[in-house]
Amino acid sequence: MPYSDKIIAETSKAPKSLGNLLGRWAVKLDFPVIKISDYTGATRQSIYNWFGGSEVSPAYRRSVENLLAILQSSSTAEEAMRKCNKSK
């Protein structure tokens, strides 16, 4: 399911941070928030907050960094999902 125009606009305007970079790549690849939640263990609300520039708490930092690397090395959401499944 594509991201809403509101989420896309908020993500593109927010200061670049770890969570915001995750959001920018998720939007670019249309990688679902529920999959980010599954991978990181964070709530969907937390993830949307990260997209908007909120700080990623230390408990989630490593999984967010790992997922960001997966998204950055993928050309499609499907490819990223396959890589996520292999890395778990």
Question: How would you name each of these model-derived features?
Answer:
Residues 79-88:
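Helix-turn-helix/homeodomain-like alpha-helical modules used for DNA recognition
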Residues 25, 39, 50:
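Residues in the recognition helix of alpha-helical DNA-binding motifs
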Residues 2-29:
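A short, Lys/Arg-rich alpha-helix, primarily the initiator
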Residues 42-56:
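Recognition helix of helix-turn-helix/homeodomain-like DNA-binding domains
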Residues 35-37:
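Short alpha-helical "recognition helix" segments of helix-turn-helix
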Residues 58-78:
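DNA major-groove recognition helix of helix-turn-helix/homeodomain DNA-binding modules
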